């Protein structure tokens, strides 16, 4: 359980602030911190407690994730929020479970995060849904029926998401052929040569932010002109900044877009968040050097925090087991990425996704998917 120092309740932030997912982790933390600025206290049995946020960097590394999780556990957190990057969530999950501390995933979309773990929940949609969304988009909107599927070897997110895309493509009568690369690869010329000679009419690349920019630039430099598609990871302004005018015909699914007029809760979030970021130099830096762009992982951080404080109040306790039970039964209306309710696996029940594209160095809204 957790011991409270004075009248505080501790919430752990389990996120990468370094490594290949550091940029994404920082944007999720901003969402969590912004939510905390709006709701800085919780009321437990009529008594007000201040929420103290404690961060541990999992460094985007599967091997370092358990130590980061252990840090939070030893500091007596009541609940954990995170992480960006499914591999780190999967690696840390058993530690949270054994310590009876519930964790709320932000944008970690691999089904394995919550599978067989009663203590892991998540607010985002998951890869089977996202894979189907993008396969339908590729097939029906872009006419891409014979895709190259670029996968990072040994990465849970990349392989899992790619597999769901491939299955749905085949169900629709199309094809997706796997082309693998090693983790630290920076030269994709062999893959591009294969794509050209095989005549693939689309690329699906569920890869990191760092790799995304290289794949886009090298594809266009080598004369590969087909649509390049991906998922939530690509919703990061740095990809647009680093690819410039090479970023043509790029599409990816995301959790949220500020331009979707049908999302009223989202509009209020966008206004408030931009103001809050603009107040502080470090916040601007962590948001990718701007107060105007909002990555769709940021509202995932916000929604996860709101779920956490709601569950603590419902539980009437700072004990992990009680908070876990409250989360399992939780229903929260009017969050930024939609109403929240968890299924028996602890996954958010979601039917909503947006598809974005890159235009004139910016990430812009393309369409909405309602399954």
Which functions belong to the PLM regions below?
Residues 1-10, 41-45, 74, 369-371:
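Short, low-complexity disordered leader/linker segments with a strong preference
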Residues 12-33, 56-62, 85-87, 150-159, ...:
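Extracytoplasmic "Venus flytrap"
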Residues 13-15, 72-84, 104-106, 148-151, ...:
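Periplasmic-binding protein-like
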Residues 96-98, 162-259:
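Extracellular/periplasmic bilobed ligand-binding domains
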Residues 120-183, 201-202:
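An alpha-beta-alpha
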Residues 281-299, 307-360, 364:
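Segments of small-molecule ligand-sensing domains
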């Amino acid at each position: 359980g957790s011991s409270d120092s004075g009248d505080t309740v501790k919430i752990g932030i389990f996120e990468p602030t370094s490594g290949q997912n550091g940029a994404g982790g920082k944007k999720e933390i901003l969402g969590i911190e912004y939510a905390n600025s709006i709701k800085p206290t919780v009321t437990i049995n009529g008594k007000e407690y201040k929420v103290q946020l404690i961060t541990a960097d999992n460094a985007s590394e599967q091997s370092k994730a358990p130590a980061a999780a252990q840090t939070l556990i030893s500091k007596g957190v009541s609940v954990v929020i995170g992480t960006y990057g499914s591999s780190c969530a999967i690696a840390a999950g058993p530690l949270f479970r054994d310590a009876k501390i519930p964790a709320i995933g932000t944008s970690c979309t691999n089904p394995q995060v919550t599978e067989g773990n009663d203590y892991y929940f998540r607010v985002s949609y998951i890869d089977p849904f996202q894979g189907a969304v993008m396969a339908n988009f590729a097939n029906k909107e872009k006419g891409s029926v014979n895709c190259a599927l670029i996968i990072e070897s040994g990465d849970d997110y990349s392989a899992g998401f790619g597999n769901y895309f491939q299955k749905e493509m085949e169900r629709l009568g199309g094809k997706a052929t796997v082309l693998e690369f090693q983790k630290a690869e920076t030269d994709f010329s062999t893959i591009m040569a294969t794509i050209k000679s095989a005549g693939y009419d689309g690329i699906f690349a569920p890869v990191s932010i760092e790799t995304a920019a290289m794949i886009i630039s090298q594809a266009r430099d080598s004369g590969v002109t087909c649509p390049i598609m991906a998922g939530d990871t690509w919703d990061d302004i740095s990809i647009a900044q680093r690819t410039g005018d090479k970023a043509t015909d790029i599409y990816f699914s995301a959790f949220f877009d500020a331009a979707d007029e049908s999302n009223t809760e989202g509009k209020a979030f966008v206004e408030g968040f931009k103001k809050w970021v603009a107040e502080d130099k470090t916040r601007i830096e962590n948001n990718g050097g701007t107060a105007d762009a909002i990555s769709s992982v940021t509202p995932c951080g916000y929604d996860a925090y709101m779920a956490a404080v709601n569950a603590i109040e419902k539980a009437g306790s700072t004990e992990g087991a009680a908070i876990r039970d409250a989360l399992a039964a939780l229903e929260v209306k009017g969050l930024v990425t939609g109403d929240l309710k968890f299924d028996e696996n602890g996954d958010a029940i979601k039917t909503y996704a947006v598809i974005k594209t890159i235009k004139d160095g910016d990430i812009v809204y393309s369409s909405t998917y309602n399954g």
